[in-house]
């Protein structure tokens, strides 16, 4: 049973390179059980400033879970169980545009799903839900993230289309050119889907801070895991500053009428 002091209204899902935000003033680790199995790791819960926050490393500590094997349903369910209303996702991405440079942050507003073999919904029957993904991210949380990044002088692109591939391999040159020229995507990653739509089904406010770590192979610059890791390390301090400042601005719950996230199932259930 989850105790009251193990509740949090804000959740951080850390991606590649961010396995510990390092900004808790006090914290404890808890294990959360879900109907979908175990989340990626223990959840760290504690105080960041005066806010109660839950942190979950998406790939587990030590990056031991590849993107196509992550238990996304368990991760989102566990955060919901802890009382999380706001979910801030942090991800490493590749750039499909030369003007989205290494070290830039992107707050995407759209995505394209090219994944293949994942569990996409909590509603597998007998109850079925068709949630709208027209605007897949919480606009209130996105705007606040953009505003905060500007205040901190972090180079941030205010919109972008994230194409999510299955992984764990990187793209071929032909695929990369297709994502860029045909699909008109701006950034590429492997973990947004189904995390974003599961958060929507859970009626949580969700936004992604995408950190550009490399150019995809259209640029004829080879992509290596080592390069991604190096640039991610350089981005980590900026991410911590942004997370700390953004979290201090978030209210306990979304203001009435500020977004539709908490009503996402209102017209979705069949």
Curated annotation (Swiss-Prot):
EC number: 2.4.2.28
Residues annotated to bind phosphate: 16, 58-59, 91-92, 191
GO biological process: L-methionine salvage from methylthioadenosine; purine ribonucleoside salvage
Result when mutating residue 259 to S: Reduces thermostability of the enzyme
Protein residues bound to substrate: 190, 214-216
Gene Ontology molecular function: S-methyl-5-thioadenosine phosphorylase activity
Annotated site residue numbers, Important for substrate specificity: 171, 225
Entry keyword Glycosyltransferase: yes
Pathway this chain belongs to: Amino-acid biosynthesis; L-methionine biosynthesis via salvage pathway; S-methyl-5-thio-alpha-D-ribose 1-phosphate from S-methyl-5'-thioadenosine (phosphorylase route): step 1/1
Disulfide bonding pattern of the chain: 138-205, 200-262, 259-261
Known outcome of mutating residue 261 to S: Reduces thermostability of the enzyme
Record family assignment: Belongs to the PNP/MTAP phosphorylase family. MTAP subfamily.
Subunit structure: Homohexamer. Dimer of a homotrimer.
Family annotation (PANTHER family): S-METHYL-5'-THIOADENOSINE PHOSPHORYLASE
Protein name: S-methyl-5'-thioadenosine phosphorylase
Organism: Saccharolobus solfataricus (strain ATCC 35092 / DSM 1617 / JCM 11322 / P2) (Sulfolobus solfataricus)
